[in-house]
UniProtKB/Swiss-Prot annotation:
Segments for region (Disordered): 1-70, 179-248, 286-351, 556-592, 649-725
Superkingdom of this protein's organism: Eukaryota
Listed CDD domains: GAL4
Name this polypeptide is given: Transcription activator of gluconeogenesis HCBG_00867
Membership in a protein family: Belongs to the ERT1/acuK family.
GO process terms (BP): cellular response to starvation; gluconeogenesis
GO terms, molecular function: DNA-binding transcription factor activity, RNA polymerase II-specific; RNA polymerase II transcription regulatory region sequence-specific DNA binding; zinc ion binding
Keywords: Activator, DNA-binding, Gluconeogenesis, Metal-binding, Nucleus, Transcription, Transcription regulation, Zinc
Length: 775
């Protein structure tokens, strides 16, 4: 409303509409300047011609390229944020002063990201001169608001104090966390403010993990000191320190000893994003406070927090050092608790000043995952229910101490604790965690390439001896389909490439050895020719094939081919009835006269399974490099000629004994002879066979043995002594139950999954197979 309108004049001055039109045109070019110039005119009611000329000159100056540009503020005020106008860094801003809103000018609240939903608004404010959000002050402010209400005078003062601590440069903490902790480390001193407020600084109740070592060494504190005394006593040398080492400044971003990154150099709108980015890099690089001597923690392993971990374990090798630092956690529990009491330095560094060693020695052990001070955690996490008073610790410790004392009184003859040196005298052998063999030995030992040509020739000869012409033709077609691919990939390889190929195979096999030993699944690894290169003990238990026989270190005397006689006859008659070794063609009765070489995969499967395997191998060898095949098969049990003869003698004797008189004793004697020959040829457990022989040689004992004795004696013996006995699938357990699988027809029905791993030349290098019996 113009001045002429207020005075009652019927027509406005001619300059007023001109200025209004000019102002409306300039608002599109610079809405901020137009609104700022228009607001005083509307409030004061100035409508003179001089006012219109002033607006015209201001609009003209807005287009001046030499006019200084206004910088954008880091955070706009609430009024400017709602009006989408440019604000300033000062509070109150100039626009709010012009509009008379200087009392209500405060920073606007931005929309939080999803990962910041639990962060308070103060934490998202940008820091000025290394002054970041103070969790201690914020917690006290929230407590005051809950007690006095949001509009009380005390809360207004607290909010002003928080803002002053946040923005004032004088509130920056000059406390050097790293050097102060290092200087107090040898003296056993604790910064006073760490112990003053346990609810604000719960870092005292945090157990550090192997990924970050503590900043304070409390090894000089006695381990049996109560929590109350440990928290109330503060050293006199640190009484003049009033700053909180972790509270006033969130952390010192310029100090390389904490996180090795500078938050000020990162272009983030808030410190949460910078902290997340910096901590990810800190965790990925492994560059923390962990000493270089602790190689186990640098690998990111999770150690177990127990009372035997001492401060001297990290780099100090004295006689009082725990011998099992990151070994078996069971061995850590066997260390005597008195050892840490006699040595003042042998305190639990993972318990720090919480209970002075009591929690680590008396209470159950726990796994420490991460234990940076709680000030570095999300502010929302400190508000969760936790033990914030020392009365809870005192009560728990008192109950546990009384219970422990009662146990000692009721059991005066309690054996002494087992010490680690005592374990050595008792002959306790600690398992080797890592092999002594180095991968470098593989590159030094391999001098010649592996002859795959002779391996394929031996495979072809074995297939022709064992399978019928029709089945041999099916296998030959499958191998012929991938023969051109083998020729194309190997024709450009020279001698050095072939040697390198064998080194790659041995190096990969070296990695699979740990996998096979750690995995409880029957597993074998073979070359592309089908020759067995590695085998697990579970596979030997399942099939009866010894590892030395499969790897070619002992002669292969197996005569069980599983397909020469009609299906279901239950016989072990081989195709070569004279017991010829399928590898060398020599007689197997000679007891090891044949040539030793690795067993082919085709010798472990029945006829149908072998044909199916090579058909799938032809599709997967040069097909999907990450593909796998999952199907069923039948594994052949390891049976020698003596085993087959003993089985036939036992069955004939039992059949004759059932027809004539007194046949029971003859059957028992024949079964005893069969048992003796079988145990000699297989080299099985001598104690179990001896027990079976003693039971069978008694003429009075003509009744069939129980299922447990038959399982202990082996599957072959159970078949001889009780041919009509059936094994329940639920009764299979342990090694004895695995041995009795396939005792009838010499075949173990399994489900197996296998895949092909290629080398650097994209040639099939090895085949990894996992078996599970169908029970």
């Amino acid at each position: 409303m113009t001045a002429s309108t207020q005075n009652g004049s019927p027509t406005p001055p001619p300059a007023a509409p001109t200025a209004t039109n000019q102002e409306s045109k300039n608002m599109t070019a610079n809405p901020a300047d137009a609104s700022e110039s228009q607001s005083p005119a509307n409030e004061k009611g100035s409508g003179t011609a001089e006012s219109g000329q002033k607006h015209t000159s201001t609009a003209a100056n807005a287009k001046d390229p030499l006019r200084p540009r206004r910088k954008k503020a880091k955070r706009a005020c609430f009024a400017c944020q709602r009006a989408h106008l440019t604000c300033g860094d000062e509070r109150p801003c100039q626009r709010c002063i012009k509009r008379g809103l200087q009392d209500a000018c405060h920073d606007g609240v931005r929309k939080k990201a999803k990962y910041l939903h639990d962060a308070p608004n103060e934490a998202l404010m940008p820091g000025i001169r290394r002054n970041f959000y103070n969790q201690a002050n914020a917690t006290r402010t929230n407590a005051n608001q809950q007690q006095n209400g949001p509009n009380s005078n005390s809360n207004k003062d607290s909010r002003q104090n928080v803002a002053a601590n946040f923005y004032s440069p004088q509130s920056a903490s000059n406390f050097d966390v790293y050097t102060q902790a290092k200087s107090q480390q040898g003296q056993g001193h604790i910064p006073p403010t760490v112990m003053q407020d346990t609810s604000i600084n719960p870092s005292a109740f945090q157990a550090p993990s192997p990924t970050s070592t503590p900043n304070f060494d409390l090894s000089s504190n006695p381990p049996n000191r109560n929590l109350s005394s440990a928290m109330t006593q503060t050293p006199s040398s640190a009484s003049n320190q009033t700053q909180d080492p972790f509270g006033a400044a969130f952390f010192d971003p310029s100090h390389p000893a904490l996180f090795n990154f500078d938050i000020a150099s990162m272009n983030f709108g808030n410190r949460y994003g910078a902290l997340e980015f910096g901590m990810l890099g800190h965790m990925a690089t492994g560059a923390g406070d962990t000493p270089p001597s602790d190689s186990a923690t640098q690998r990111g392993s999770i150690g177990r927090s127990s009372g035997t971990f001492t401060a001297q374990n990290f780099g100090d090798s004295t006689n009082t050092q725990s011998p099992f630092l990151f070994g078996d956690p069971v061995l850590n529990d066997w260390n005597p608790s008195g050892q840490s009491q006699t040595n003042p330095r042998n305190n639990n560094i993972y318990n720090q000043n919480t209970v002075a060693g009591q929690m680590g020695e008396q209470h159950p052990n726990a796994f420490a995952i991460e234990s940076a001070p709680m000030n570095f955690a999300s502010p929302g996490s400190t508000e969760s229910p936790q033990m914030t008073t020392m009365n809870q610790f005192d009560e728990a410790n008192a109950k546990f101490s009384s219970r422990t004392a009662l146990m000692h009184q009721t059991n005066p003859h309690q054996p002494p604790p087992i010490s680690t040196p005592g374990l050595k005298h008792q002959g306790f052998q600690v398992g080797v965690k890592r092999r002594y063999r180095s991968p470098s030995s593989i590159y030094e030992s391999v001098k010649e390439p592996y002859s795959y040509t002779s391996g394929f020739h031996n495979l072809t000869a074995f297939i022709q001896r064992r399978f019928s012409p029709q089945k041999t033709l099916q296998i030959a077609k499958a191998l012929a389909s991938i023969r051109p691919s083998f020729i194309a990939t190997t024709k450009t390889l020279n001698q050095d490439d072939l040697i390198f190929m064998e080194k790659c195979f041995q190096r990969t096999l070296w990695e699979y050895e740990d996998f096979i030993n750690a995995c409880g699944t029957p597993t074998i690894v073979c070359r592309r020719t089908g020759e067995i290169a590695a085998v697990g003990k579970e596979f030997s238990i399942l099939t009866g094939w010894k590892k030395e026989v499969l790897l070619g270190k002992e002669p292969n005397l197996n005569v069980n081919t599983g397909g020469s006689s009609p299906r279901g006859s239950g016989t072990f008659t081989p195709r070569n009835g004279n017991g010829v070794d399928p590898h060398s063609g020599m007689s197997a009765a000679g007891g090891g006269g044949g040539r030793t070489q690795p067993v082919f995969l085709a010798e472990l499967l029945d006829d149908d399974s072998v044909i199916e395997f090579y058909e799938d191998f032809a599709k997967l060898a040069f097909g999907d490099s990450r593909g796998s095949v999952m199907t069923t098969c039948k594994l052949l049990k390891y049976k020698t000629k003596e085993d087959s003869a003993a089985l036939f003698q036992g069955k004939e004797a039992q059949q004759g004994g059932s027809d004539g008189k007194g046949g029971g004793g003859g059957g028992d004697v024949a079964a005893t002879a069969a048992t003796t020959s079988t145990s000699t040829s297989n080299g099985a457990n001598s104690s179990g066979h001896a027990n079976a022989n003693r039971n069978n040689t008694n003429p009075k004992n003509s009744s069939p043995p129980s299922s447990s004795s038959a399982a202990a004696a082996g599957p072959l013996h159970g078949a001889q002594l009780s041919p009509k006995q059936t094994w329940g699938k639920r009764g299979i357990a342990g090694e004895a139950g695995m041995n009795q699988l396939g005792f009838r027809d010499g075949k173990v029905e399994c489900s197996y999954c296998w895949t092909v791993k290629r080398d650097v030349f994209d040639i099939p290098m090895l085949i990894v197979m996992n078996f599970l019996p169908c029970i």
